[in-house]
Amino acid sequence: MCVIVAKYFEGTGWVGVKNRDRNYVPDLSFRKKQNKNTETLYFWDDITQYCEGMNDSGVCVLSASLMVLDDEKEITVRTKTPSKDGIKIKKALKLTDIKAVAMSLIKQKLPGCTLIFNQEDCYLLEGSWAPGGYEDKDYKYKIEKIERDQTVARTNHGVWLKWAGYQYGADDNESMSAISSRSRLLIAQHVVDSAETPAQLIDWLTKKYVDNWQLNAMRLADEKKMMRTTAQLMLVPKDLTMFVRPIQSNIKFNFWKLNGAKDNKMWVELLTNRVLHTGEDDPAIPTNLSHIED
């Protein structure tokens, strides 16, 4: 369960941010790979081998799950079988054209809410298996170009594909997840509409807007199997830079290997979590959240 947002900033272009939620504490790392026509930089979950990121043509991919059965599985050991979604994203990011990347994800039937963007353009893809099953049913999708005067936010329920993701009434646990997804979407949309800089965009997604942490865009948890935000990821195509803020995760990196080469094209920057403990310059609480905890 995650939050993704994107906004166009004058002078910077499109910027995408993701709050990545898991019900385990992941081991994270970064990987660069030289392909035939492009180089790719991935944010990598060492346990599941899920990945997302950018290429040196400035095309970026961030995704939030709509596959609720898979999303709720607790994964505690490393697997030799790579994440299917990660494989699809890796394959798509080998392409240099943003439309080709989007079409690759569609042809591979990537489920979820997915942002495909570069400095100039942004597309949102919602994809899911038709009601009734996973992968044995027809793949349905909708993709639209997001205009520069628009913003976009998604969590873990379908907005265009109404049946997809967490729904009310299936059972108590899924109903609670459905409430969380809709609360997080309201907060994320408020943040992306209010932010005037990329720094505000990522920082304001850490704030506590309602008392229950599970209803906030950033979720904290101490109990096992509870969803918690493990890291934030911000991709800035103009600068070919991946900003990462570890929150509840273990992260391993070699800055010299990532950023030290003379011909380096893409960059990794780590952000402090100090923002979690300060309240300076926070946006107002959205008025339409007053009923969420009732």
Residue ranges and their predicted role:
Residues 1-294:
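N-terminal nucleophile
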